[in-house]
Regions:
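Active-site substrate-recognition segment that forms the wall
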Residues: 1, 96, 119-120, 127-226
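Dinucleotide-binding Rossmann-like beta1-alpha1 core, especially the glycine-rich loop
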Residues: 1-48
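Helix-loop-beta segment of a Rossmann-like dinucleotide-binding subdomain
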Residues: 26, 46-84, 104-108, 116, ...
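Short aromatic/basic micro-patch
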Residues: 39, 88, 119
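A conserved short coil-to-beta-strand element within the FAD-binding core of flavoproteins
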Residues: 90-105
């Protein structure tokens, strides 16, 4: 996917420094990406992104990065594992971790659909539960200290023709200078992400009005007609 990183008067990082970093980025792909990064001037940038704010625009860096459908990628990974002999079970919640001779030997799980409970025995365990990692750890170590610092990342979706971006755009939030993106997603533009501390239950996470305003302020600063 093509990305455009606009540079405006007063930005903390100019095109020269961005180019130096993007040479490293190109090198990480062994220079086998679709194309190497390019530096655009004011006119070229507006030719490619005519809805971008012209006032104070110095130019932009153009480069390529990868994108994926995260849900599809996850399902494909599970299906590939099953194809190699793994057993995949959905809608199971771990309620107890079992030990035998001081070592983990199994997990007590409950089917969230039927309510049935049963035990799964194993020799090796991987706690890949994302933001619920500490909750699962405490089934085995009730007094264990948290190892995660939870943060909330919010995206919003708006009609792409409302924003007017043709490429993925790198944005800096006016409020704190944080880097985020406006990414084309079919006929929508996905704007985000935020990154704020979060202390409630992961399953209760939701965007609030301040999150939405933070993201809208960022995209409006770059696309005034939006």
């Amino acid at each position: 996917m093509p990305f455009v990183f606009p540079v405006f008067r007063g930005d903390p990082v100019g095109r020269l420094r961005l180019s130096a970093g993007l040479w490293v980025y190109d090198g990480l792909s062994a220079f086998r990406n679709i194309a190497r990064h390019r530096s655009w001037g004011h006119r070229t940038t507006l030719r490619h992104e005519p809805q971008l704010r012209a006032d104070g625009l110095r130019g932009a860096m153009h480069y390529y990065d990868c994108w994926t459908d995260d849900a599809r990628l996850t399902l494909e990974t599970v299906q590939a594992a099953v194809g190699e002999g793994a057993v995949a079970c959905n809608h199971l919640g771990v309620t107890e971790l079992l030990r035998d001779g001081g070592h983990l030997s199994g997990a007590r799980v409950t089917d969230r659909v039927t309510g049935a409970s049963f035990t799964i025995a194993a020799r090796q365990f991987v706690n890949a539960t994302g933001p619920w990692l500490d909750r699962v750890r405490r089934l085995d170590e009730p007094e264990g200290k948290p190892v995660l610092r939870l943060t909330k990342g919010v995206h919003i979706m708006v009609p792409r023709d409302r924003v007017g971006n043709r490429n993925a755009i790198v944005l800096r939030a006016p409020r704190d200078g944080r880097v985020m993106f406006a990414i084309p997603w079919e006929d929508q533009t996905m704007i985000g992400t935020t990154d704020t501390d979060y202390e409630a239950r992961p399953e209760d996470v939701a965007a609030d009005a301040d999150d939405v305003r933070y993201l809208l302020d960022a995209v409006n600063a770059y696309f005034p007609a939006a």
